[in-house]
Design a protein with these regions (language model features):
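Short Gly/aromatic-enriched secondary-structure transition segments
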Residues: 91-95, 211-218, 274-283
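Non-catalytic, conformational "gating/processing" segments within enzyme and secreted inhibitor domains
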Residues: 102-268, 290-375
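Detector for small/aliphatic-rich hydrophobic stretches
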Residues: 2-160, 405, 409-411
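C-terminal soluble interaction/assembly domains
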Residues: 345-412
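Internal alpha/beta scaffold segment
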Residues: 267-292
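Extracytoplasmic/secreted cell-surface and envelope-processing proteins
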Residues: 87-91, 271-274, 308-310, 362, ...
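Beta-sheet entry/capping signal
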Residues: 63-64, 194-195, 261, 388, ...
C-alpha cells in the first residue's frame, strides 16, 4: 500500500523588510537599501503570504503542502493590472496593497525582481513571467505594456484550439523551472479560455555549510499521531543563528554568500505545529528573526523531496477575492474593454528537494482568464518531529519558502 504522505511543506514567497538583523554573516553581500514603496510592497506581500499560508494549512490538515506566495503574488499582480472597479478593490484588499498605488506596485515589483535575481552570485534564483492569449482575442495595449515593462512578461498569441498551444506553454514552464515542473496547462484548453498569466520561479542554493553524506543515517521521525517513520537524517555541528523560546527552537541555515537562507521552526514537545503556525504574523516574525544570535548547534535535519499542486480558487475567495471568480460580476475591462471576463482557475504547482549539498525548489502559478458563458556539547537541535522551515533572502527579507513538515520523505 502506498505510504500516506503526512507532512506539510508550505513555501511562501512573500516579500517584506526585516526590522533587524536578517543576517549576521560578515560575508553577506552589501546591497542597496529598499525604497519606501518597496518596503511597503514587501510588507504587503508578507501579510498576504502569511494569511495564504495559514488558510491553506487550515484546509489541508496533516498533508504535504508546498506553495510559493511570491509566485502567486506576481501572477496575481499581473492580473491586477487588468482589473477595474470593485474587482480591482477586492484584489487590492486581498493582496494587502494598502495605500500603494498601482504605479507603485508595478515599479516596486520591477525593481525587486532585479534585486532578488542578482543578489547572490552563488545562488540561482530566477523569476519569469508570461502572458498567453487566444489568437483573435483583442487585448488592451495598456495591459500588455504594463506587464511587459514592469514584470518583463513574454506575451504571445496562440491558437488555443490546437494541442500545440498547451505544449508551447508547458515547454516554457519546463524551461524556466529547469525541468522540475513540466506542465501547468491541461489539454484540451477550454474553448472559452482566452488567456493564461503565468509566473515561474526557480531556486537552487548550495548550503554555506554543507552536510557530510557520511554522517547521514537512517533515523526515526515522529508523526503527529505519535507513530514513527524512517527518514534519512543529515547532521553537522556549526555556528548558526539560533533562537528559542517556550514554544519552539529555530535555526537559520545560509546558502552561498548568505544572501538567502532556510529558517526552521521546530515546535517543542507538547506544542501543536498548527497552533504555532496560527501565530505567524508580521509582528511575530520580525520579533523572532530579530532575536536570533550566533551559537554552536548540533543539528539533525531530514532529507526530503516532494511535488505539490493546488487550485487556489477557494482559498483566494475566502481571503476576499470572490468577485474576481464571478462570471457575472468580475470586471477585467482593462484586459479587454468588452468585459465578460473572469478568473476561472488559479493553478499552483511546486517542487522542492533538500539534501546534504543544496536546496532546489521551483514554483509555477497560472491565472486562467475565461469568457463569461451566455448559457552532544552545547546546544543540540534534533529535528525528529514535525517542524516549520523558511527559505528567505536576507536583505529585503523576502521569504522564498515556508514549510511545515510532519513526515519527511526521500527517494533516490
Amino acid at each position: 500500500m502506498q505510504k500516506l504522505l503526512n507532512f506539510v511543506i508550505v513555501t511562501i514567497c512573500i516579500i517584506f523588510i526585516n526590522c533587524s538583523n536578517s543576517s549576521t554573516n560578515p560575508n553577506a553581500n552589501i546591497v542597496r537599501d529598499l525604497t519606501t514603496a518597496e518596503i511597503k510592497l514587501t510588507e504587503s506581500d508578507n501579510k498576504f503570504g502569511l494569511k495564504l499560508f495559514k488558510e491553506i494549512v487550515n484546509s489541508e490538515e496533516n498533508k504535504n503542502i508546498f506553495i510559493s506566495p511570491l509566485s502567486i503574488s506576481m501572477a496575481l499582480g499581473m492580473t491586477y493590472n487588468g482589473a477595474d472597479s470593485t474587482t480591482l478593490e477586492a484584489m487590492h484588499e486581498t493582496l494587502e496593497y494598502g495605500d500603494l498605488t498601482t504605479q507603485e506596485v508595478n515599479e516596486s515589483y520591477q525593481s525587486l525582481i532585479k534585486l532578488l535575481t542578482e543578489l547572490d552570485p552563488k545562488v540561482i534564483f530566477d523569476i519569469a513571467n508570461s502572458i498567453w492569449y487566444r489568437e483573435g482575442f483583442s487585448v488592451e495595449n495598456d495591459f500588455i505594456g504594463l506587464n511587459t515593462t514592469y514584470f518583463d512578461a513574454v506575451v504571445r498569441a496562440l491558437d488555443f484550439n490546437a494541442d500545440s498551444a498547451a505544449d508551447i506553454i508547458n515547454e516554457w514552464v519546463s524551461e524556466k523551472t529547469n525541468g522540475k515542473i513540466e506542465e501547468i496547462v491541461d489539454k484540451p484548453i477550454d474553448p472559452l479560455t482566452v488567456m493564461f498569466l503565468i509566473n515561474a520561479i526557480y531556486f537552487k542554493g548550495t548550503w554555506t555549510y554543507e552536510f557530510d553524506e557520511e554522517n547521514t543515517t537512517d533515523d526515526i521521525f515522529y508523526l503527529p499521531d505519535g507513530s514513527e517513520t524512517q527518514c534519512k537524517m543529515m547532521s553537522h555541528k556549526n555556528d548558526h543563528n539560533y533562537f528559542e523560546n517556550e514554544q519552539f527552537q529555530a535555526i537559520d541555515l545560509p546558502y552561498g554568500d548568505a544572501g538567502f537562507s532556510m529558517t526552521i521552526f521546530l515546535p517543542k514537545p507538547g506544542i501543536d505545529i498548527d497552533s504555532l503556525i496560527a501565530q505567524f504574523s508580521n509582528d511575530s516574525w520580525n520579533s523572532w528573526i530579530s532575536s536570533f544570535s550566533s551559537q554552536e548547534v548540533n543539528l539533525y535535519l531530514p532529507k526530503f523531496k516532494m511535488e505539490y499542486e493546488k487550485s487556489l480558487n477557494d482559498v483566494l475567495c475566502t481571503l476576499g477575492m470572490s468577485i474576481a471568480f464571478d462570471p457575472y460580476q468580475a470586471d477585467f475591462t482593462k484586459i479587454n474593454s468588452d468585459g465578460n471576463l473572469y478568473i476561472s482557475n488559479v493553478k499552483h504547482k511546486t517542487f522542492v528537494k533538500v539534501n546534504e549539498e543544496e536546496t532546489e525548489a521551483a514554483a509555477v502559478t497560472s491565472v486562467e482568464i475565461t469568457l463569461t458563458s451566455v448559457g552532544e556539547t552545547g546546544i543540540t537541535m534534533c529535528i525528529n518531529h514535525p517542524f516549520i522551515f523558511v527559505i528567505r533572502e536576507n536583505h529585503s527579507g523576502t521569504i522564498l519558502f515556508i514549510g511545515k513538515i510532519v513526515e519527511p520523505e526521500w527517494e533516490d
